[in-house]
Amino acid sequence: MGPDTTSERVSEDLMQAVTCLKRVMVGMKSNGTDYVQEQTPSNSTTVICTLVKITGALERCIESNKAMNDVLNGKMKCTTCGATSVGLLSDCHDSATSTTTTVSHRSSEEPPRRKPSAAGGDHDDEELECSSIESRSIRSVSSSVHTSAEDDETNQTMMVPTDVADVINAIVAGTNGSSNSNTTSSSKSPQEEEEEHDLVMKSILSTTTSTSNTKLELSEKLENPLQDTALLDQFLQASLLGQTPTVTPASEENEEDKEQNAVLTSFLQILFANQQAGNAILDAGSSENDGSTSSSQPSPPADPTASLDSLAMFESLLAESMNGNVLDANTSSADQKAAARKRKSTPMKVPKSENGAGYICPMDGCNKVFKEKGSVHRHFVTHIGMRFNCDKCKASYTQKHALMLHQKIHANPDAYQCRGCGTNYTTQNGLRLHRQRNPACMEVSNALEFNTSLNTSISEALSGPLSKNSSPTKQMVSAP
């Protein structure tokens, strides 16, 4: 008996036992007189009858085992409570154990004796002995099952009797005792035998259900996975053996995990490279000290800046990786924004007019026609609401070239300025149009122009006579 016991193994062993018993019965019927006389002084017919009853009992055990399997699989109903689930059959365990105890107590008592009748005494004795053997075999099986159930409660392991040899030995011992004793036992009624058989099967079912639950709990405890410490093991092995670690990331890692593992790998390689270099320097210094005994000066210590260099390099690697990620993110976002702006400002397709003389605005509801495609693009910006703002003032324009003309005002503010209101313009045409739209500014500008022209003419008139009068005086002075 062991933890690997199953109902299938029990049924196989019982079938083998039945086959062996049938062979023994056939052999004893053919030439069983001498064999029985050598082994036991009992009658051969009694032994054959006993074996027949034993075989029948074993066959009934096999059938009950099959019935138990059907009940466990949910194919049959319990004879007591009518349940088809294994968990519900465990409720019958208490009643089964108590009744099994009474059955075992009855089997320990001596059966009542009957006096053999004069006529047909041998035949009656054989029947009585066979019935007593059958009842004792069933009681022995029930007692063995009862003990196994008690062991199962204490040890929490399934203890179903798979070694059929033990059961057969117990039955044969009972038959030997009955053959040696010339007493006969009273046979029980079939109803009592069926009740005993049902109790035995209930106890077996209760033990199997309890052990199956314990097996499930143990399997759940054993199936708890351990944490993955492959990277830590590799690091420890490399640090102890002085080897360069090789980090092998999992196949299903994310991109961030892969980048972190790459940085960690580079750091470990740099660290162990510096460590190996320091070890090589120390080994070289020790060999030089061993070879030259005349030099009493100790070897110089290892360079303490090696570890600092490795840490600085590691920090630079981390900074580069972080800056690279940030720059990549910024450039990608800027490129995406520029592309989106370009897509918004430029129509996908500029259709031509019906006669093919120009280009039509693709915006719904706008039927303007332009001669050039660039004009359509500049006009399309007005529909999407995009504006170009001046960085020096609050002016904003729908077209870029208008902003460029506006920025000339900030470069030369007095180039084209209205004298009436002080407004600056980038072109002379703009100033002229402003004067035409504003008559007051036109009058002020005309008056100012008249005054300036008058002043210039007066200055010229005054400067002319003075120059003419000065020349003769000079001549007069210069004359002899």
Swiss-Prot record:
Residues 92-160, 174-198, 282-307, 328-351, 461-480 are annotated as: Disordered. InterPro entries: Znf_C2H2_sf, Znf_C2H2_type. One of its GO terms (molecular function) is chromatin insulator sequence binding. Pfam families: zf-C2H2. GO terms for biological process: asymmetric stem cell division; epidermal cell fate specification; neuron fate specification; positive regulation of gene expression; regulation of transcription by RNA polymerase II. A zinc finger (C2H2-type) spans 359-383, 388-410, 416-441. Coiled coil: none annotated. SMART domains: ZnF_C2H2. Keywords: Metal-binding, Repeat, Transcription, Transcription regulation, Zinc, Zinc-finger. GO terms for cellular component: chromosome. Residues 95-105, 131-145, 174-187, 286-296 have a biased composition (Low complexity). Probable transcription factor, involved in regulation of dopamine neuron lineage specification. May play a role in maintaining robustness of the Wnt/beta-catenin asymmetry pathway. Third 'degenerate' zinc-finger domain essential for function. This is Zinc finger protein ztf-6. It comes from Caenorhabditis elegans.
